[in-house]
Amino acid sequence: MTAQHQATGTAPGANLSAHTPMMQQYLTLKAENPEILLFYRMGDFYELFYDDARKASQLLDISLTKRGQSAGSPIPMAGVPYHAIEGYLAKLVQLGESAAICEQVGDPATSKGPVERKVIRIITPGTVSDEALLSERQDNLIAAVYHDGRRFGYGTMDIGSGRFFINQFEKEETLLAELQRTNPAELLYPESFTFLHHVEGRRGLRRRPEWEFELGTARKLLCQQFGTQDLVGFGVEQSETALCAAGCLMQYVKDTQRTALPHIRSVRLEQPDHAVIMDAATRRNLELTQNLAGGHDNTLSAVLDCTATPMGSRLLKRWIHQPIRDQVILKGRQSTIKELIEQNLYDELGGLLRQVGDVERVLARLALRSARPRDLTRLRQAFAQLPELQRLLAESEHEAVQQLRERASTFPELLDLLERAVMEVPPVLIRDGGVIRDGFNQELDELRDLANGATASLARIEERERLLTGINTLKVGYNKVHGFYIEVSRANSHLVPAHYIRRQTLKNNERYIIDELKKYEDKVLTAQAQALALEKRLYEELLDALLPHLGDLQESAAALAELDVLANLAERAETLDYRCPTLIDEDQILIEAGRHPVVEQVMTDPFIANPINLQRSRRMLIITGPNMGGKSTYMRQTALIVLLAHIGAFVPADSARIGPIDRIFTRIGASDDLASGRSTFMVEMTETANILNNATARSLVLMDEIGRGTSTYDGLSLAWACAEQLASKIGAYTLFATHYFELTRLPELMEGLANVHLDAVEHGDTIAFMHAVQEGAASRSYGLQVAALAGVPKSVIQQARHKLHELESATPVAAGESRPAPVAMAPQSHPVVDELEAVRPDELTPRQALDLLYRLKQML
């Protein structure tokens, strides 16, 4: 060991002969897996040494100790029990770490020197398939990114389903949006990657050698995987930058899985013009699957996701994060949801699908030959539901429903095989035995009879020996340490025949063995070992019998997941009173009585629904009103309703007519980006620049309080210029919320703009927010009243009122003047009285009357 290694305790890189044979074996295996933690099997433990031990001790909160010496220095060591390994691996995966599992593969009885060991699996965050290591309702993706100097190539793979997608684009903003959308558990990048500032801080980062991104290598690997001569049939042949990323992905997955990947059967190019594009800021601000605090409560998916299966839940989240523009597909989803509601099928479908479970990931483990016995029982249970699902779907004549019915095939032969082959409730692992059902294989039955027949045979031996020895208390027994034995009390030991051989002495008893019992023991133990070996072979044959059907099984699983999502959306529409939006070709967003899908679920009072009308002659709304008045909610609900329409779902509104949308942008709220050294204002301007550079006439843009982070005149000027650009040059559908009342003049100066405001009623020092959108500009911002509601001291509010009066009167008070007297407030009538005086009862619908009643109650 070098001086450096002696000082640090790290594993040496040369001169293995100085180490013990066991450590030589370890160091050789570690050299093959230098960058990941190596769990080295030693008896009932997995042990880690040197730097791996130190790192594991910190990450897993396990003790760091020493294991003797090798090459003259102590060996740092940490370990975990073999039966608890899955829990520790799960923690490592969550932390973005990888691990290599090294098992004993040789026979200790015949080994000369250390028992042969080898790495049998490598666990990485993006390639795990074990059920215990995955979040069942979240996709677990591995991704690779490459830049060729002109454009980015980006690829994602889901080992748990076999989905494999690539994409290429030119802008860094698109890379950020893709990373936000796909959220890979592991990200591969080349050594020369110069955009690390976009990925730094992510877990699961892996730097890979340049050769893994070579185009020729990528084409060869992919053609080998798919069994084709070229990639033309997949439509990706010309996407060379993306193929470089795909090649690295395939190489890495093959290296880590160390087995064939039959469930990865194609690669698809994602077309940006097929989707409604959302950047990273938009996904964050709309709180689609993650709220602003990083949790999952009070998000769109939390409201929408009542799916029956984990694979359905994952598909729904993919739909939410990638709304589409193809109206044929969207209208097909809408009509299917309508059919499931009208035929009242969604509830019964949900009950059946709950019994299907997560077939998608079971099939992935089957493809990787890592399926466990209970995976096969889950498949059997799923197969058993399919005939009833087919019968239920046959009740509908709807074309799309029948297409789903055809795709969700039944597999009676496989169901019969699994029913005959697998125990009702098998053990977790095949190594425990007892997986194959009695009667499936005659040879296995005979071996089991021999192994399990010990009870009757031992009873006969026991009865005979009692008669021969005259010892009525003589017993024949068995334990794992000493095997079979004849037990005699100490008091009767003098009656034992001479051919009895003492095996064990206890406090009150003696235990013996005889030749016949020893031979029987050998026979039984041999039968048990043979039965277990045969059972393992039969289990592998079961997997072999299932694998040829993998493609059909995957197609059926995909149909079941889609059916689950559509049935779930039907249930949500009925339960939450959503309506089917009308998708049109004209430039219009017309929503009657729209509601925020999340906010209305967390409110105790009824949600105040609001309309919106955007069209060619009215493309921008300047929104004014008090803080807390509901401007941001109104803007977000519009975006969410448009998004829901573009996943084919029903929407929270009385009606909606929605024209083509290509992008959704939001510039709502901001905070300092301390890691990048950017102020709140800089973050705001960066997001604004992205909108102004990329929005089109068919984009939906939400702009909230542009220009707040700088001086009043700078902010007003920027807000004015941004509004003009969006309205006159770009022509995007725009909701522009502002506190700059000067902007309310824009509709007088330009076509296509309109003022709306959210109403509030003031009474004395209090304010009641109506949350109702009205035409025209707000008369004031009510900032002082909101400050009072927030608990700002009354003396400060009083001083602010005086200063406001001065500013509005343009008569500033000289510096150093004494404290001003309170500004007298004009007598005001009660707001409830004002509201009632304006009501025309005969013109109110029952719904409007109920809403009015709740508003009046809020004002008291």
From Swiss-Prot:
Recorded family membership: Belongs to the DNA mismatch repair MutS family.
Ligand binding (ATP): G625, P626, N627, M628, G629, G630, K631, S632
CDD domains the record matches: ABC_MutS1
GO CC terms: cytosol
Protein name: DNA mismatch repair protein MutS
Function recorded in the entry: This protein is involved in the repair of mismatches in DNA. It is possible that it carries out the mismatch recognition step. This protein has a weak ATPase activity.
PROSITE patterns according to UniProt: DNA_MISMATCH_REPAIR_2
Organism superkingdom: Bacteria
UniProt KW keywords: ATP-binding, DNA damage, DNA repair, DNA-binding, Nucleotide-binding
Gene Ontology MF terms: ATP binding; ATP-dependent DNA damage sensor activity; damaged DNA binding; mismatched DNA binding
A Pfam family annotated for this UniProt entry: MutS_IV
Organism name: Aeromonas hydrophila subsp. hydrophila (strain ATCC 7966 / DSM 30187 / BCRC 13018 / CCUG 14551 / JCM 1027 / KCTC 2358 / NCIMB 9240 / NCTC 8049)
GO terms (BP aspect): mismatch repair
InterPro entries for the chain: DNA_mismatch_repair_MutS (IPR005748), DNA_mismatch_repair_MutS-lik_N (IPR007695), DNA_mismatch_repair_MutS/MSH (IPR017261), DNA_mismatch_repair_MutS_C (IPR000432), DNA_mismatch_repair_MutS_clamp (IPR007861), DNA_mismatch_repair_MutS_core (IPR007696), DNA_mismatch_repair_MutS_N (IPR016151), DNA_mismatch_repair_MutS_sf (IPR036187)
